[in-house]
Amino acid sequence: MLRKQDPMKTAGWKKLSDHFQTMKDVHMRDLFAEDGDRFQRFSIRFGDILVDYSKNRLNQETLLLLLGLAEEVGLKDGVEAMFTGERINETEDRAVLHTALRNRSDAPVFVDGRDVMPEVNAVLKKMEEFSRRVISGRWKGYSGKPVRDIVNIGIGGSDLGPKMVAECLRPYAAKGLSVHFVSNVDGTHIVETLKLLDPETTLFMIASKTFTTQETMTNAHTARDWFLKHAGDPAHIARHFVALSTNTDRVKAFGIDPENMFVFWDWVGGRYSLWSAIGLSVACAIGFEGFLDLLQGAHEMDRHFREEPFERNIPVILALIGIWYNNFFGAESEAVLPYDQYMHRFPAYFQQGNMESNGKSADRGGGRVRHQTGPIIWGEPGTNGQHAFYQLIHQGTKLVPADFLAPALSHNDVGDHHAILLSNFFAQTEALMRGKNREEVIEELRREGRSEDAIQRLWPHKVFEGNKPTNSILFRKLTPRVLGSLIAMYEHKIFVQGVIWNIFSFDQWGVELGKQLAARILPELNDRTTVAAHDSSTNGLINAYKQMRG
């Protein structure tokens, strides 16, 4: 099990607090000037991925102290506890083994003394057979036509993960097959999607472990009603709906053939489920070989994380850097900035991954934490963000550590687009690190021929303090294998931070209260009586809503 230890009471935390006093005003310009080998010293290569963390407000002593904290809180034991199937998700009494889903070795993985790999591989085999039938056109709809559109209906991890991967790997998409994703219970989402579809050639994948998720099942029933309006016979549902679930009775009641039900297990958390049967839409979108490459890339990062010494361990290093800013510099958010349009959903995916995992205020012993935990995660693809929020990162009053991600090779190498894109990628991290001081600004304005009055008026607005931290993650090309490694890298970073912060990263009780209250409010919306059972604001809003609807 994971240790229950307040990190603020450790010797390592005290040493870092003292060290922060010597580092808080050190400028990265000086760190680079003092160390010509800083890039080599603070970067790590992993296959086709290069992680450069040299543009951070740290030195070798900082890194050693952070590594010491990781050792002191028992991180190594925590990593082994996860990989060996201990029930580290204590509040739900579950193991955490999404790593088993992408275990491409012959090694067994045990939960409660039972090797789960035969079941994992059996589901993978079933996914392979099904995806090949769909892609080849051998899976026919009720009218004998092959599938041309797949609609994944899910929410949270059952939507964000597959959608992000399908978008990232669109260059590998199977020809003649389009994949759509519906998640929001707002009827607009399903209605606008259905407008694009032909019921004779559409396959729906209903992704809900229990087959009771309100948003998912509401959308699923709307999709079924639309389908039956055209197809007529409920027997045709079996050719156009499959289930990613564990509830056989509810799947059958919906009209889906249990043979077309793809199972997963309670040791797979929703936000880590894209590696499971929840990834069936991905296997159909990019082909099963591509899905296996995705798993392989993640497995390789799993091995790196489990086996590599912490000082050369990418997820550990990234996690420790995040703790340095979150808990000592007081940074409240982190930006994820991919310079690849295919990765436009990558920040949103890890917004969920990070904030749902580490957005906790109770420690593992049941007390309230005394330190900051999970950061706010946000971002947009470059160069869009440069013309939106980079102003704040460069010259605002908030410290926003940022990860910049980019491929050396584009899937669409047209003209000089990619060179321009990457020139911005390199320029932004340099500008954020170096900045531009008063003397440089004044000299630049003088070269422009500005008057001394104009110079004195303008220079304060054109100064860039710099010293803004970034990690640069450069990879050769966005392939399924590389993407798998990148996703696993961030997953493990999140886990490491949760271990150090003494919180449980694999539950999500914060989503429950709103659902409970919504279940109570829903029947109140369907009658004409004045509502008075809530606080005055909620009562007023509900009654205004009912009045507006007539």
Curated annotation (Swiss-Prot):
It is found in: Cytoplasm. The active site is at 356 (proton donor), 387, 515. It catalyses: alpha-D-glucose 6-phosphate = beta-D-fructose 6-phosphate. GO terms for cellular component: cytosol. Its EC number is 5.3.1.9. Gene3D superfamilies: 1.10.1390.10, Glucose-6-phosphate isomerase like protein, domain 1 (3.40.50.10490). It holds the Pfam family PGI. Catalyzes the reversible isomerization of glucose-6-phosphate to fructose-6-phosphate. This is Glucose-6-phosphate isomerase. It comes from Syntrophobacter fumaroxidans (strain DSM 10017 / MPOB). The gene is pgi.
